């Protein structure tokens, strides 16, 4: 499941960019195809990494959230972002600086942010 490029990018977009709807995932700059996105979201839900709920403002739309299992991937994704920043030009240098300045504080903020979203 996690060896798939698209699954990790979806989790990254949820964790670091705040993407929560199908449309927000499609708007990512990687250009994921709709059939691949739908398949990976289904698999992430089936593996207990992501959960869904109906959007209160539009019951036809789903809101995706990371589960505790998904949030536990924060250290893995942080290391991947830092590795990419060390070896390639990355788009969000401010985020990389935050990670490098105090990785544990950054991770605590990510975890707390998702816990807050889950309690809404």
Region annotations inferred by a language model:
Residues 13, 49-51, 79:
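Solvent-exposed, amphipathic alpha-helical segments
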Residues 68, 75-120:
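C-terminal regulatory/oligomerization modules of transcriptional regulators
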Residues 26-59:
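Canonical helix-turn-helix DNA-binding module
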Residues 3, 56-80:
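Basic, amphipathic "hinge/linker" alpha-helix immediately C-terminal to the N-terminal HTH DNA-binding motif
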Residues 1-33:
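N-terminal helix-turn-helix DNA-binding core of bacterial DNA-binding proteins
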Residues 18, 48, 84-88:
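A general structural signal marking secondary-structure boundaries and capping sites
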């Amino acid at each position: 499941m996690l060896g798939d490029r698209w699954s990790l990018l979806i989790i990254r977009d949820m964790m670091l960019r705040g993407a929560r709807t199908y449309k927000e995932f499609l708007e990512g700059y990687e250009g994921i195809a709709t059939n691949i996105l739908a398949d990976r979201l289904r698999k992430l839900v089936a593996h207990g990494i992501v959960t869904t709920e109906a959007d209160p403002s539009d019951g036809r739309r789903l809101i995706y959230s990371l589960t505790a299992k998904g949030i536990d991937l924060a250290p893995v994704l942080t290391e991947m972002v830092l590795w990419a920043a060390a070896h390639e030009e990355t788009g969000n240098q401010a985020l990389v600086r935050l990670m490098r300045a105090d990785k544990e504080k950054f991770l605590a903020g990510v975890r707390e942010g998702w816990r807050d979203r889950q309690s809404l």
